């Protein structure tokens, strides 16, 4: 599943013309959408619209975060964000670890000049 999901995340950035961002969910700046992998994936799958103001909320009311937690599980989702953001693996839960590994892989591919760890 991780390889397919990584490919889908990369495709989401490419087809939607997104720029990756860390430690935030979404920032619209000068006609460019800077988004985290969860927002990229949620928009790519048609779950949320890129104009939805809730995807810019850094917290629990973020529509993309809520969707990802329901779809992939909360631990996996947190792990993915931590890995992408360059955070050290904080838990040993298998779902968290899988998400963290995917986040690191996504950051390595999408941000080659700024490796996550």
Predicted regions and their residues:
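Domain-length accessory/inserted modules outside core catalytic folds
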Residues: 1-35, 41-117
């Amino acid at each position: 599943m991780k390889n397919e999901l990584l490919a889908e995340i990369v495709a989401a950035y490419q087809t939607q013309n997104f720029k990756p961002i860390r430690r935030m969910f979404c920032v619209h700046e000068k006609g460019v959408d800077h988004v985290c992998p969860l927002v990229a994936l949620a928009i790519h799958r048609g779950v949320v619209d890129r104009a939805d103001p809730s995807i810019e909320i850094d917290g629990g009311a973020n529509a993309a975060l809520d969707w990802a937690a329901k779809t992939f599980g909360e631990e996996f989702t947190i792990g993915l964000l931590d890995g992408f953001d360059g955070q050290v693996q904080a838990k040993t839960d298998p779902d968290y670890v899988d998400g963290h590994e995917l986040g690191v892989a996504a950051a390595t591919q999408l941000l080659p000049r700024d490796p996550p760890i």
